[in-house]
Amino acid sequence: MIAILMATYNGEKYIEPQLKSILCQTIRDWVLYIRDDGSTDRTLSVISKFIKKDIRIKLVSDTVEHRGADNSFMWLLNKVNADYYMFCDQDDYWLPNKIENTISRMDSIEKERGESTP
């Protein structure tokens, strides 16, 4: 399983196109874990709309606000267990074959150098 990790903070203007781009991926075996850092705009409302449409999108909550993006990603890494991890920012836009191309390249490297190669 592929875990996509996203940290958000006041990303209302950007997050919808990013979520749509993730939903359009050619590989479907993924779960998106989102940790919001205390947004005061409509970011959580936009995320909730997508959660209702797709069970692969999860909002992971904790009681600490303003961890910052780097600490939010580290927090998610400690909470999520997966075969592969991908990181995305709220203002990214992924081409439809991003996951497919990434996994394909990683598989090639693992075959060449062994599975313990990061």
Residue ranges and their predicted role:
Residues 1-118:
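Nucleotide-sugar donor-binding/catalytic module of glycosyltransferases
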